[in-house]
Structure formats: C-alpha cells, structure tokens
C-alpha cells in the first residue's frame, strides 16, 4: 500500500474489524495524512480516523547473544473506516472486501 507494510494479527487487532477498525504496521516516516491518502486510493474506502503509536525498539543481539545495538522503531496505525467502506484484504471473497 505504500507506507503501510502489513496487517497486524494480535489478540486486540483480531477484534478490531468488528468496529470497522484495522491495525497495520507502517513505515516510521509518513504522517497520518500521507497514510490516509494512500489507503483512500482503494475504491470505496473512506477513513474516519487514524490513530498511531510508535512501538519500542528492541535490542539487536549479536552472534554470541550480546546486545550490539537497537533495531529500528516501527509505527503502528489503527484506521477507523466509514460504515460500508471496507478495506480489500482478501481478494475473491465477498467481491474482494471484508465486511
């Protein structure tokens, strides 16, 4: 999707589609406005709100198990959609949209 990397499948994220919300990891640099424009390029997708937070960076471990640095911090976006405007996650099911 350009800016949005992959959907998240945590316990909370699995329950979000019931409330027309979707959680995904995103590149750390784009703003909420840029991500909104990229997602709304899909036909019939309109966004009501975007919430984001930055995940903590983890320790990068070397070959001997010692900490050698930090991994890159990532951003997580929770997108709320308008009613009857789903994101096409699974092509081929219900006209390519998840309801």
From Swiss-Prot:
Origin: domain of life: Eukaryota
Location(s), subcellular: Plastid, Chloroplast
Keywords per UniProt: Chloroplast, Plastid, Ribonucleoprotein, Ribosomal protein, RNA-binding, rRNA-binding
GO BP terms, alphabetized: translation
GO cellular component: chloroplast; ribonucleoprotein complex; ribosome
Biased composition range(s): Basic and acidic residues: 12-21
Composition bias type Polar residues, residue spans: 22-32
HAMAP family cross-referenced by the UniProt entry: Ribosomal_uL23_B
Protein name per its UniProtKB record: Large ribosomal subunit protein uL23cz/uL23cy
